[in-house]
C-alpha cells in the first residue's frame, strides 16, 4: 500500500480518480471562527490548492459568496488582489447561503430556486431593519446620543444578502445586563422581524421566508419560540430572515445533481431541481 506523503501527491491522486467529488463546509473548517465575521481570514495556500482540484471540489456553506461579508472578499484579501481570483479561477466553487447562491471558480453566479421578487425584497431588508430599529431605540432608549445609537444599529444589523439578521448582543450589553430591559428589547427585535415577514406577504411572498431565532425553544404552530431573558442568560440574541427551503442537506442534493449531470449528461433529480423542491 502506497502512503501519500506530499500535498502534490494527494492532489494528483484526486485528479486521477474518475468519479470523486469533495464537498466542504467553510466556517469552522477552513476559515477559523472569530467573534467579528468581518475579521475572518482564509489561507492563501488553501485557496490556490483547492483551485487545482477543478470540478472535483465544491463548497457547501450557509455563509455567502458575494457581498462585503462574503467569502469572495476573503479570497481576494488572501491573494492581495481584487482581480487575480477572477482571472485565474481562484474563487471557491459551489453553493452558499445554505443552497441558493451557486458560483463557479470565476464567480459567475446563479440563484437556483429564487425569483427576482424575492431577491429584490431581500436587498431592501437591511435598510428596512435599520429604519425600524432606529425608530424603536429612539423610543426605548431616548437618552442615547445619535452617535451611540448609530453605532448600536450598525452592529445589530447584519446585512448579509440572503440571510439578513438582527443581532442584539451589543445592545443587550449596553443596558448593562438589566434583564427586564433585555426582555423588552427581545420583544422589539421580534416585532421588527415579524413586520418584515408581514411586509413580504403583502407583496405576494407569503411562502418565501421564515424567521430563525438563535437560540430558541423549539416550534409552535410552525414558528420558532423566543427564549426570553432570565437572570442567568440572555436567551435569544439573533433573529435571521431565512429563505424557505434553504438548508444544507437540500443543497448537497443540488450539488450532486449538477455533478452527476456533468459526468453522465443526466440529471438524476431533474434539470430544474433546487432546494425549494427537494424532499422534506
Regions found by a protein language model. Give the residues of each.
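Active-site phosphate-binding/coordination module
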Residues: 40-161
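N- or domain-start disorder-to-order transition segments that initiate the globular core
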Residues: 1-14
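A short acidic (Asp/Glu
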Residues: 34, 68-74, 105-106, 168, ...
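Asp-based phosphoryl-transfer active-site loop
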Residues: 13-39, 59-60, 94, 252
